[in-house]
C-alpha cells in the first residue's frame, strides 16, 4: 500500500510515529492489536442505505415459503431507505462494549446478551446524571438493539447496531434529532484486525486494550527551521491524503454486486426445483412460480441498486482523487517555498562571500600606500584650512 511508503527507513504518512506503518504488515501483527475506538459524527456522516423488504432468503426457497401479507395476499420484494452511520471498520467486536452518545449529549453503555438482545446500562445525561433512556429530542424514549440482518429497518425511535457490517442504523426520529443538533458519537471495540487493515491510532482517538495507552487524534505537523524565524512543514499525514472510508465504499459496491449474484443463484435454484419430480405437484409449482415472480422483481431491484452503487462510487472515488491531488498540490507548494528560500539564502551567501573577499583578500601593501596618501591629503587640507581661518575681518579694514 502506498500509505506505507518510507524514506530512509521512516514511514512518511504516520506523523511523529515514523517507526510505525500505516497498515498492519502481517496477520501476526494484526492479531496483536486490540483497541477501543471512539468516532464522532456530524450530519454529513449520515448516509442513506437501500434495504429490501419481503426479500426471499435461501430458507424461504427450501421451505417454499411464499411472502404474504396479513390478509394472505402475495407480496413482492421492494426497496426501502434507512439512515446509516458507517463506522470506520466492519466486523467490530459484537461481544464488546458500545457507548453511544446521542445528539443531546446523553450516553448509553450497551453490551450484547447471549440471546442477541441489547443490555443497556449506565445511561447518563450531559451533566452526568442517571436517566432512564436516550430520547429522540422530543422526549420519547429511544431503544437500542443489535441486528445481523443486512435489510433491517429500525423503528422511528430506535438505534440498531450491526457489528458485522460496522453500521449504526438510526430511526426516523433519532435521525431528525441527530441532523438538527449535528452531533453523534460511537465508541466500540475491535480486536480482529487483518493484514492490510489501517492502524486506528492514525485516524481516531482510541485506547490500546493491551497496553492501556490512550491515543488522542490530533495534528502532528513536523516542521523544520529553514531560515531565520521561518519554519516549513515537511510531512503529510495519512488522513490528509487517504480517506479511511475508501475501503468501506468499495465494500458497498461489492455487496451490491454480490447481492445481485446471490439473487440470480436463487432464481436458478427455483428454476431447477420446478423441474424436480419432488415439486411436480400443482400446489408446489404454484408456490415456485410465485417465488420466481418475486425473485425476478428482486433481481431487477438489485441490478438498479448495483448501477446506483457504481454511479455513487465513481463520485466518491473522484472526491478521494481530488483529496490526493490537493495533498500533492500542497506538497508542491511547500517545495516551491523551500526552493525560493534556498535561492534567497544562496544569493545571500554569495553576497556575504563577496563582501568577505573584499575585506579579507585585499593587497595589504596597496592599502597602506592608499591610506598614507589619503592621510597626506587630509593633513594638507587641514593645514590650508587653518591658514585661511587665521585672518579676521579687521585684517581687511584700513
Q: What are the residue ranges of the model-derived segments?
A:
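Generic detector of bulky aromatic hydrophobic side chains
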Residues: 49-50, 112, 187-192, 204, ...
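Extended beta-strand solenoid/passenger and fiber regions
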Residues: 2-155, 192-209
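Generic serine detector
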Residues: 26, 40, 45-47, 90, ...
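Non-transmembrane, interaction-prone segments in cytosolic or luminal domains
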Residues: 50, 54, 58, 72, ...
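Mature, Sec-exported extracytoplasmic domains of Gram-positive
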Residues: 51, 62, 66-77, 82, ...
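Polar, low-complexity export/assembly segments characteristic of proteins
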Residues: 2-18, 153-323, 327-330, 337, ...
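Amphipathic alpha-helical polymerization modules
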Residues: 1-2, 70-73, 290-398
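A sequence-composition feature that detects small, non-aromatic residues
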Residues: 8, 17, 30-33, 55, ...
Amino acid at each position: 500500500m502506498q500509505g506505507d511508503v518510507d524514506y530512509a527507513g521512516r514511514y512518511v504518512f504516520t506523523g511523529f510515529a515514523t517507526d510505525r506503518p500505516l497498515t498492519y504488515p502481517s496477520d501476526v501483527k494484526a492479531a496483536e492489536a486490540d483497541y477501543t475506538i471512539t468516532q464522532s459524527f456530524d450530519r454529513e456522516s449520515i448516509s442513506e442505505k437501500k434495504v429490501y423488504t419481503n426479500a426471499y432468503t435461501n430458507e424461504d426457497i427450501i421451505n417454499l415459503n411464499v411472502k404474504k401479507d396479513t390478509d394472505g395476499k402475495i407480496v413482492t420484494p421492494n426497496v426501502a431507505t434507512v439512515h446509516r452511520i458507517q463506522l470506520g471498520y466492519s466486523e467490530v467486536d459484537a461481544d464488546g462494549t458500545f457507548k453511544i452518545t446521542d445528539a443531546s449529549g446523553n450516553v448509553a453503555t450497551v453490551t450484547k446478551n447471549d440471546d442477541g438482545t441489547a443490555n443497556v446500562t449506565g445511561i447518563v445525561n450531559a451533566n452526568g446524571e442517571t436517566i432512564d433512556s436516550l430520547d429522540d429530542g422530543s422526549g420519547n424514549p429511544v431503544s437500542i438493539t443489535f441486528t445481523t440482518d443486512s435489510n433491517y429497518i429500525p423503528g422511528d425511535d430506535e438505534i440498531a447496531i450491526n457489528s458485522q457490517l460496522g453500521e449504526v442504523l438510526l430511526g426516523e426520529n433519532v435521525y431528525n434529532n441527530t441532523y438538527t443538533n449535528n452531533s453523534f458519537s460511537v465508541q466500540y471495540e475491535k480486536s480482529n484486525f487483518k493484514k492490510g487493515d489501517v492502524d486506528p491510532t492514525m485516524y481516531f482517538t482510541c485506547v490500546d486494550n493491551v497496553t492501556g495507552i490512550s491515543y488522542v487524534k490530533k495534528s502532528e505537523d513536523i516542521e523544520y527551521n529553514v531560515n531565520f524565524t521561518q519554519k516549513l512543514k515537511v510531512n503529510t499525514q495519512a488522513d490528509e491524503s487517504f480517506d479511511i472510508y475508501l475501503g468501506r465504499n468499495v465494500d458497498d459496491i461489492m455487496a451490491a454486486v454480490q447481492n445481485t449474484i446471490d439473487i440470480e443463484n436463487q432464481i436458478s435454484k427455483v428454476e431447477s426445483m420446478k423441474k424436480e419430480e419432488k415439486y411436480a405437484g400443482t400446489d408446489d409449482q404454484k408456490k415456485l412460480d410465485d417465488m420466481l415472480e418475486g425473485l425476478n422483481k428482486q433481481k431487477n431491484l438489485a441490478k438498479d441498486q448495483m448501477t446506483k452503487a457504481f454511479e455513487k462510487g465513481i463520485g466518491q472515488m473522484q472526491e478521494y482523487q481530488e483529496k490526493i491531488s490537493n495533498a500533492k498540490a500542497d506538497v508542491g507548494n511547500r517545495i516551491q517555498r523551500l526552493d525560493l528560500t534556498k535561492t534567497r539564502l544562496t544569493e545571500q551567501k554569495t553576497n556575504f562571500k563577496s563582501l568577505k573577499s573584499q575585506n579579507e583578500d585585499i593587497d595589504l601593501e596597496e592599502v597602506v600606500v592608499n591610506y598614507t596618501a589619503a592621510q597626506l591629503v587630509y593633513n594638507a587640507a587641514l593645514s590650508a584650512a587653518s591658514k585661511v581661518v587665521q585672518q579676521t575681518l579687521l585684517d581687511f579694514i584700513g
